[in-house]
Amino acid sequence: MKILLIGGGARESAIAHALKKNEEVKLYTLMKNKNPGIARLSEEIKLAKETDLDAVKEFAEKVKPDLAVIGPEAPLGEGVVDLLEEMGISAVGPKKLAAQIETNKEFMRNLFKKYNIKGSLMYKAFEEYGEELESFIDELTEKGIKAVVKPVGLTGGKGVKVVGEQLKDNEEAKKYAKEIFETGLGGGKVLIEEKLEGVEFTLHGFVDGDTIKFTPFVQDHPHALEGDEGSITGGMGSYSCPDHKLPFMTEEDVKLAKEIMEETVKALKEEVGGYKGILYGQFMLTKEGPKIIEYNARFGDPEAMNLLAILKNDFLEVCEAIVNKKLKDIDVEFENKATVCKYVVPKGYPDNPVRGEPITVDEEAIKKTGAILHYASVNEDNGSLYMTGSRAVAVVGVADTIEEAERIAEEATKYIKGEVYHRSDIGKKELIKKRIEKMNELRR
């Protein structure tokens, strides 16, 4: 069984490991840099940009895969699934039109409005800076609501700025909106939303167009520094619990979050003829219940590493059920284990990361800790590893309790050396307690 994998980060490393648990699988990977972990699992690799559709086509023609799995969002936004399906290759991932749920934040908000999906919020999209934008932000200010400023298109998770975090006040939000128009960031259109107060969580679903099968809930940590300080990153690490929900969630929260995603899948069927692949909802749990911050059209990174580490099914079976519209016929099951994932990143990440610096990873020592290792933004050159500026290496602890999973992941970070840092507080009970207290406070 030949599988074409597109992408070369830690998320794709987790996908590769999950697929290779099936001995029939032969992996062929197209990625930007040589990820040593993925390269070892692959029969053949091609180094090319994941958005280079000509390179994808050429590699796919050569390999003739039975199935393709798309890791990152950028190729989905370029229409890589449309291309592969035209070649007769089934792909786990949405077509370009359906991928807009991630690649076009305005499309996502309008979908919620049109189909009256629960969990929406105040928003407005703008094509230029002017009086209309200013008066919408002023309206939020009058209501005592802080603004969130988002470029409408893709920015690799780094374009969103929030009043009270990266922006001082709503006046500064106007300046940032103006900057987006001037620089053309994320396509140069701007979405202004109300800031939600609460605790963030994520939920993934495997979708075949009609059926959605859910994974455990995961909590990501987007802030660069301990105690949830610093810049917003692609995610510094994440954890999941043995009971598959999060400690600050009620059963009602779980039910509502799943309903929102089910309604979204139905709306996408009406609007674009269906969505297949992985759907990843990023939620804010507010005192009114879960609300959607945004959707992604693929696995979260880091969350894929938590989820695929405890998936009981053969992942190939799940992928085949997605493309063959057979998800209703299978039970998707996960072990009742806790997982903690921690990223080791270059110093200065995300604002001014060191690049091209060597990093050493003692794989044997990490193996002895019991942690799972995934290489991310590194490049292997003549047997040495160099950081390319984004998150470098991830380690995952899996155990019966969060405490034990956290201890395993933390122990493993000691064996990764270089100009690096990580957040040692992810998965620690103090930080989780802070989340529980925040939710209790909001619910009063």
From Swiss-Prot:
The gene is purD. One of its GO terms (molecular function) is ATP binding. The lineage of its organism: Archaea, Methanobacteriati, Methanobacteriota, Methanomada group, Methanococci. This is Phosphoribosylamine--glycine ligase. ATP binds at residues 140-202. Mg(2+) 1 binds at residues 282, 294. Its EC number is 6.3.4.13. HAMAP family: GARS. It comes from the Archaea. Mn(2+) 1 binds at residues 282, 294.
